[in-house]
């Protein structure tokens, strides 16, 4: 921004944190100094941790997710394929601990931050799917046990 005294710079930092065992978070922050922006983003990313929690080497099913103009497709892959994705999406999936997955950006945006948020939404959708599937499986097991009695 330009003021009477001259240009006033602001820096925006996007930080991804993860333990490679199913927890990942994203933080975005602005500041007048790069180091301060990174520190703020790191704290925000720690607050926004999401438990992905997949026990297998890949994701359970194909998922499409959208955030603003960014749209992403995540597909499960066979063991040994590794992560087929580019840029920040690859970093996010690595830090989440997903070993074999294919990702394709379908949206028309080149904005890395919106692409990362679209990927986070996709991982949240998968977590909801997993929870729903486990709930249905538990109901079926309960019904089978009741039939045997």
Task: Give residue spans per PLM region.
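Ribosome-associated RNA-binding proteins
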Residues: 1-149
